[in-house]
């Protein structure tokens, strides 16, 4: 392809993107008292869509009605007690740590300095989502420290906590605002780990958690 042809193609792409951006900047009047997202969906519609998509791939979404940190902590503690998780590893994130305050100390695992062998003994991980993508039932989790990066993979169960305000319709709305000096990585989690062999036999948990629950806190 010649340089002139490549330049013409790039010019057409820029023109199309500019036109698309103008269309996106058209603001539709919002209904009074109803929280709406950029695509015009209410938060209730997005949470329902997210729950359906997550259920379709074997995960579970719990959308809390009661607002407040205490309600979230209570829901997380109830989940841990219900499934009798006894070695819970919590991401060193303020929101995740706050959600885990109701878990008895005897059930919590010390994460700092933990080896891979030690983390393999955890039966549940608790991590915080930066964004939830309703169209795919995916959670975007930002992890920084070495031990935190292992949490979405090693424990057989994973609980993801998020705020209803973190719900986005699609990836283009997700808050992926990485700074130049930002450390770590972002992990996209869509349901429990699913692996299929040549005979299409699906195995859960082979390369990640076999159980995934997303608890969405009310505003």
Model segments located where?
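The feature marks the mature, well-folded catalytic cores of soluble enzymes
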Residues: 1-219
């Amino acid at each position: 392809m010649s340089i002139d042809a490549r330049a013409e193609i790039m010019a057409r792409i820029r023109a199309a993107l500019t036109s698309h951006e103008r269309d996106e900047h058209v603001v539709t009047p919002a209904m009074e008292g109803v929280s709406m997202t950029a695509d015009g969906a209410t938060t209730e519609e997005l949470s329902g869509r997210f729950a359906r998509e997550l259920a379709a791939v074997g995960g579970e979404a719990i959308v809390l009605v009661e607002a407040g940190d205490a309600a979230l902590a209570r829901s997380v503690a109830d989940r841990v007690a219900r499934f009798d998780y006894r070695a819970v590893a919590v991401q060193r994130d303020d929101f995740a740590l706050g959600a885990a305050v109701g878990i008895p100390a005897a059930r919590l695992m010390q994460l700092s300095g933990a080896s891979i062998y030690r983390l393999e003994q955890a039966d549940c991980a608790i991590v915080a989502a930066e964004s939830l993508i309703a169209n795919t039932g995916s959670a975007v989790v930002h992890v920084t420290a070495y031990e935190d990066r292992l949490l979405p993979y090693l424990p057989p169960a994973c609980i993801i906590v998020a705020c209803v305000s973190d719900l986005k319709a699609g990836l283009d709305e997700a808050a992926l605002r990485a700074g130049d000096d930002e450390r770590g990585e972002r992990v996209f989690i869509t349901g429990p780990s699913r692996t299929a062999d040549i005979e299409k036999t699906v195995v859960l948990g082979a390369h990640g958690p076999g159980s995934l629950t997303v608890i969405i806190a009310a505003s």
